Amino acid sequence: MPPSGLRLLPLLLPLLWLLVLTPGRPAAGLSTCKTIDMELVKRKRIEAIRGQILSKLRLASPPSQGDVPPGPLPEAVLALYNSTRDRVAGESVEPEPEPEADYYAKEVTRVLMVESGNQIYDKFKGTPHSLYMLFNTSELREAVPEPVLLSRAELRLLRLKLKVEQHVELYQKYSNDSWRYLSNRLLAPSDSPEWLSFDVTGVVRQWLTRREAIEGFRLSAHCSCDSKDNTLHVEINGFNSGRRGDLATIHGMNRPFLLLMATPLERAQHLHSSRHRRALDTNYCFSSTEKNCCVRQLYIDFRKDLGWKWIHEPKGYHANFCLGPCPYIWSLDTQYSKVLALYNQHNPGASAAPCCVPQALEPLPIVYYVGRKPKVEQLSNMIVRSCKCS
């Protein structure tokens, strides 16, 4: 039996003759020679935003402003809006992972907390309002050699039975034995065990860049000013079990752990090259003359562009949009473009080349009136912060 390549040769000959005899010209279905009308693109983006805002607020049309009281917004409403805006701004400062790393499959690793009986916990004993979870960073670095490879990190805790409702807070071990607040959780009474999960991606990235041998978390009872009982009533698997033998081993395997999702180094070697692509975010795109896929600036003035007076804060915002060609391995000025043209002809519903689309989006807080009542809302995914080819 002839090799498979020889069996396919009769099928490939007509296509090869087509490539030789057809004059060299770009594939008609893939031409990008048309001039982009930027004003038309912006108008379409503005109209899309009009519908997006109304849809997110579940409004069929802009609300009437006939009953809106004159004068400035109430101080309490303005304070709520400002705090929401500041929180969103603070969250956007967090570094984004490399866009290229998102493409690769992620390897999942579990790193167990150092056993609670270890002597490194001695200085934390005698604190009934807190539990301490320490991790050996050498195990973290073995699983994730470089911070850029980390996609996500979760702290997982197995909560056992809880008789009373309790508000708990999670802290990160910081410099000089201080503790930095991370998040909180309200735990309801339950007769069955439950896994708790906290996103600690940013924290673990920090640990990977530092050289501390031991890092950790603290789970504490919420300290309320009007409560005299600050005891942590939550029982977490892996602490003071009192078990021996096989039961102790099983109990220890379910002690708190970090679940790490990271790109294996061998799958992402190009991330460490000095030639790796820049993140297509506002920091790069707004300060360059990039012609390919990038974030393009677009400021929406609610009154001027949408004819709206019902949104009282902000007066407008930078919506931005993604635009630009995505470089493709089969260039249009090569003979391979004819193969792509045939592919397009037989697969009209498929995309032969990647498109420039949003990657990171930010929310937009607004203040508007419903009748005489002011409302503060946060609209998700309203600001394009970075783009990618997909």
Swiss-Prot record:
Q: Where is this motif: Cell attachment site?
A: 244-246
Q: Which SUPFAM superfamilies match?
A: Cystine-knot cytokines
Q: Which GO terms describe its biological process?
A: adaptive immune response based on somatic recombination of immune receptors built from immunoglobulin superfamily domains; aortic valve morphogenesis; ATP biosynthetic process; branch elongation involved in mammary gland duct branching; bronchiole development; canonical Wnt signaling pathway; cell morphogenesis; cell-cell junction organization
Q: Does the keyword Glycoprotein apply?
A: yes
Q: Its GO CC terms?
A: blood microparticle; cell surface; cytoplasm; extracellular matrix; extracellular space; microvillus; nucleus
- Spell out the post-translational modification annotation for this entry: Transforming growth factor beta-1 proprotein: The precursor proprotein is cleaved in the Golgi apparatus by FURIN to form Transforming growth factor beta-1 (TGF-beta-1) and Latency-associated peptide (LAP) chains, which remain non-covalently linked, rendering TGF-beta-1 inactive.
Annotated region Arm domain: where?
75-271
Entry keyword annotation includes Secreted: yes
Citing just one GO molecular function, the answer is: identical protein binding
* Membrane spanning stretches: none
Q: Which cysteines are joined by disulfide bonds?
A: 285-294, 293-356, 322-387, 326-389
Quaternary context:
Homodimer; disulfide-linked. Interacts with the serine proteases, HTRA1 and HTRA3: the interaction with either inhibits TGFB1-mediated signaling and the HTRA protease activity is required for this inhibition. May interact with THSD4; this interaction may lead to sequestration by FBN1 microfibril assembly and attenuation of TGFB signaling. Interacts with CD109, DPT and ASPN. Interacts with EFEMP2. Interacts with TSKU; the interaction contributes to regulation of the hair cycle. Interacts with TGFBR3.
Q: Which family does it belong to?
A: Belongs to the TGF-beta family.
> How is this protein named in the record?
Transforming growth factor beta-1 proprotein
> Which species is listed as the source?
Sus scrofa
Organism lineage? Eukaryota, Metazoa, Chordata, Craniata, Vertebrata
